[in-house]
Amino acid sequence: MTNQNLQDFLDGVLLKEENLNKITEVSLEKGLPHLLDEGIHNEDNFQIFTSQKIVADMIKMVGVKEMKNVHTTVLEPTSGDGAFTCAILDLRLKNIKKSDSFLKEALTGLSTIYSVEIDEELVWLQRNNLYSIFLAFLKKHGIFNEELSLLVKKILMINVSWGELITETKDNENFVCNYDYFLRNKKTKKKPAKHKHEFPEGLFSNGEGKCKSLFVNWSFADVINEIAHNSNFYFAKIAKIPGEIIQFQIN
């Protein structure tokens, strides 16, 4: 996929006005949107939503300082309605000090959070949740305007993707995308008796299987660069219907 093809896709599909208009403000409680409860999302596709306690514990485990850093890239590839992404964005915005560059820092903090979710309904919920958190930040500082609102929506349309991140090659070797922090869990249609996460062998950055080694040190820009210029990577699918489902896969 060439840079021009990618730009055509962004302009012609992803960033169409009708898509941007779907992102709307939701009500907040204590600065955060009401996230879906743990448990069944629907009868056909069982979803387990991460509790805020586990989100908080994970952020502490990784390091609050790292999550506060607006330049730290984070990928959540099974992101639901945004339990992790909303918490990280909220943490970043609350810790940005008022200065001449604070708006730039805020936008950077948003633009370095990425997620992928296969359930389209949850993708839109997550975009709305993140948009509302950022909108509240803009209004708090009296800098809200339509131009900024549109920019935030465009960032969310690109960064919060409807699709599936493939993590295995044809040789069953695991493929890990390049982000500073990569949050990975395995979806299941069967409710586990105990809270348990399963991870593919080799997914851990140091191979030891420790929780903190779930996170690897690459960046989203590197992934896009590889997709655009390396024949070993390609867009496996781009939806023919309005939307932006993308699957990253290795030949």
From Swiss-Prot:
Lineage: superkingdom: Bacteria
Gene3D superfamilies (UniProt xref): Vaccinia Virus protein VP39
SUPFAM superfamilies in UniProt: S-adenosyl-L-methionine-dependent methyltransferases (SSF53335)
Entry protein name: Uncharacterized protein MPN_107
